[in-house]
Curated annotation (Swiss-Prot):
The keyword Ribonucleoprotein applies. One of its GO terms (molecular function) is structural constituent of ribosome. Pfam families: Ribosom_S12_S23. The keyword Repressor does not apply. It comes from Corynebacterium glutamicum (strain ATCC 13032 / DSM 20300 / JCM 1318 / BCRC 11384 / CCUG 27702 / LMG 3730 / NBRC 12168 / NCIMB 10025 / NRRL B-2784 / 534). The modification 3-methylthioaspartic acid is found at D89. One of its GO terms (cellular component) is small ribosomal subunit. Part of the 30S ribosomal subunit. Contacts proteins S8 and S17. May interact with IF1 in the 30S initiation complex. With S4 and S5 plays an important role in translational accuracy. Interacts with and stabilizes bases of the 16S rRNA that are involved in tRNA selection in the A site and with the mRNA backbone. Located at the interface of the 30S and 50S subunits, it traverses the body of the 30S subunit contacting proteins on the other side and probably holding the rRNA structure together. The combined cluster of proteins S8, S12 and S17 appears to hold together the shoulder and platform of the 30S subunit. This is Small ribosomal subunit protein uS12.
């Protein structure tokens, strides 16, 4: 515990809150290039093959981003738009790819929640 004299000299400083989406550098989304597209398994108790892409962002940082929806057209060197939002059962995946933007196609035959998956009407 500091003495009053030490507090007079230095004072106390607040800890700044850690940002959940640091790689976006304050932007709502960032563009990036896929360096690897792969599937991975979620942690217990879930079981699946989740689609994930390793993306090098324009900020220079490389992150893992989840590819939402059923089916995708992404491969290495695809240009993607990345937004924040973690996937609870995939450790280390704190970003999602925006469907229907840049090289990412929207989800085919999607009827509900279309805007989230870049699906056109009809």
């Amino acid at each position: 515990m500091p003495t009053i004299q030490q507090l007079v000299r230095k004072g106390r400083h607040d800890k700044s809150a850690k940002v959940a989406t640091a790689a976006l550098k304050g932007s709502p989304q960032r563009r990036g290039v896929c360096t690897r597209v792969y599937t991975t398994t979620p942690k217990k108790p879930n079981s699946a093959l989740r689609k994930v892409a390793r993306v090098r962002l324009t900020s220079g940082i490389e992150v893992s981003a989840y590819i939402p929806g059923e089916g995708h057209n992404l491969q290495e060197h695809s240009m993607v738009l990345v937004r924040g939002g973690r996937v609870k059962d995939l450790p280390g995946v704190r970003y999602k790819i925006v469907r229907g933007a840049l090289d990412t196609q929207g989800v085919k035959d999607r009827k509900q929640a279309r805007s989230r998956y870049g699906a056109k009407r009809g």
